[in-house]
C-alpha cells in the first residue's frame, strides 16, 4: 500500500509540475506535490460520483475511489513521522467551517482520524477577520515563509468552508558545503545568456547515475536525518533541459530515484548555485488540465461534506518557497484546497538550467519538485 500511495502522489508531482512549465520561459518553478495531494485529499474525502472519479483518474488511482483520501492523508502523515529533530518536516491540515454550515459527522470523523483539525469561522459576517486568522495559521505552520496566503476578498460571505494544508521542511546537509569554497561563477541561462551566481562546491562520497538516454547527470545529496535527500538532475547541454522536461514521466522519475539510490557511492565534485524560489499559483487551470473539472462547477458532487449538492470549490491556491545554501534546505508550502568505477572524481556542475527533487527515502514520495532556470532571478 505504501508503494501505491507514493505512486499516486508522484503521478501528481509529474503532472502538476509539467503543467507549470512554460516552454522556452526562463522561469524558476517549484511546487510541493505532498502539500497539493494532502489538500486534494480533504476535497476527495467529501467527493462522490464524477467529482471523485476525476480526482482519482488524474492521480492514476486504480483502487476503490473511496480509499483515495485515506491513502493520500496516510502518506503525508508517514512522511512527517519519519523525520528526527535534525531534519524537521511538519505537515498540518485544517478545515474551517462557517458557523451556519453543518458538515456531516462522517466527514468530520474521517478528518479527525488523520489529526485534521476542524474549526469554526464566521465567513458570513467577518470574512476579512477570518482571512487574517487563516493566513496567520499558515504563516505559523510554515515558519513564516508564507505570508498573506489568501489575498483580500478571496474569502467572502459566500464561503462555506476552507480546506488548507501547510508543509514545512528544513534539512541540514549530511555533509555541508564549505562556505569558504563558494565563489562567484557563471550560470548559463541559455546559449546566449549568462548570469553571475554564488556557486557552492562540495566533494564527497555520493550516489551518482548518468542517464545516457536523457543525457543528464543525477546525484543524491543526503540530509543529516538520512530520511530525506535532494536529487539533482543536470543536463549535459546548456539547453538540454527542455528535452528532459518534454519526456518527463512517472516511470522515468521512478527509474531515476531507483538507479541513483541503488548506486554505489563514489567521489563526486558537486557545483551547485545558491538559490531561493517562491511561487504562488491559482491551481484551477492546472488541475483542469489534468482532467479535474467537476469540483469547480455547479455540477460538483461534494455531498460527502454536508449531504447536499449545492457546494463547489471556488478557489484553489498553492504556494511553495524553497531556499538552498551551504548549510542545507529550507522549504515551505501551502495549498488551499549503474555506474562504472572511475579513478577521477565525477563532476556534476549545475551551471545550467536543472531540475531538483526533495524525496522521502522511506515512502519514496516527492515533497518538492522544481526547476532552476536562473538562480539570479
Curated annotation (Swiss-Prot):
Domain of life: Eukaryota
GO cellular component, one term: extracellular space
Keywords, comma-separated and alphabetical: Glycoprotein, Protease inhibitor, Serine protease inhibitor, Signal
Signal sequence range: 1-27
Single annotated GO MF: serine-type endopeptidase inhibitor activity
Annotated glycosylation sites: 301, 361
Chain residue ranges for the region called RCL: 328-349
Reactive bond for chymotrypsin, annotated site positions: 342-343
InterPro entries listed in its UniProt record: Serpin_CS, Serpin_dom, Serpin_fam, Serpin_sf, Serpin_sf_1, Serpin_sf_2
Entry keyword Cell membrane: no
Annotated domain remarks: The reactive center loop (RCL) extends out from the body of the protein and directs binding to the target protease. The protease cleaves the serpin at the reactive site within the RCL, establishing a covalent linkage between the carboxyl group of the serpin reactive site and the serine hydroxyl of the protease. The resulting inactive serpin-protease complex is highly stable.
Family that this chain belongs to: Belongs to the serpin family.
Additional comment: Possesses several potential secondary cleavage sites.
Described function: Inhibitor of serine proteases. Inhibits chymotrypsin, cathepsin G and human neutrophil elastase.
Name of the featured protein: Serine protease inhibitor
Lineage, broadest ranks: Eukaryota, Metazoa, Cnidaria, Scyphozoa, Semaeostomeae
